[in-house]
Amino acid sequence: MINIDYIKSKIRDVPDFPKKGIVFKDITPLFLEPKIIEKIVDDFADFAKSLNIDAIIGAESRGFLFAAPLSIKLNKPFILVRKPNKLPNDVYSAEYTLEYGSSRVEMHKDALKPNQRVLIVDDLLATGGTVAAIENLVRQAKGIVAGSVYLIRLGFLKGEEKLSGKVHALINY
């Protein structure tokens, strides 16, 4: 039986990556066991069902790893949010800061219709900067953020305080 403790045991801490002072949570070992991913997606689906969503937004790149199978499981559209200059059509754009730098995210303008309710999926919630920027994209498209879901939440960074909608994480540190 796969439980939270088992999943946590497979996540590696990598000190000083991508820069000094950061402890990176390496989730790649989880993907060596498909049943772990199935358990994570099932948990995310249970949360999503309570939100009455119309679409799922995945954050590049590790958010895609969970958003794609979740969209298939729930039969909901999957909207990709990518780093700058990776989408070929007209985009909404939003700036943000990370735990270890700053960047921008983009979403196709025709991906989300006004008043659609979305669930944002990412692997990790740290400072909340990435997802706050994605929420900005949703507002630009006149959509509604129903919530966001993560494999890992670093609670000590209080990222959820920057976010709207319900927040759920399978693992909390």
Swiss-Prot record:
Catalysis performed (reactions): AMP + diphosphate = 5-phospho-alpha-D-ribose 1-diphosphate + adenine
Keywords, ordered alphabetically: Cytoplasm, Glycosyltransferase, Purine salvage, Transferase
Enzyme class name: transferase
Primary location recorded for the protein, binned into one broad class: cytoplasm
EC number per UniProt: 2.4.2.7
Coiled-coil portions: none
Family: Belongs to the purine/pyrimidine phosphoribosyltransferase family.
Function: Catalyzes a salvage reaction resulting in the formation of AMP, that is energically less costly than de novo synthesis.
Cross-referenced HAMAP family: Aden_phosphoribosyltr
Protein's name according to its UniProt entry: Adenine phosphoribosyltransferase
Organism, scientific name: Ureaplasma parvum serovar 3 (strain ATCC 700970)
Organism taxonomic ancestry: Bacteria, Bacillati, Mycoplasmatota, Mycoplasmoidales, Mycoplasmoidaceae
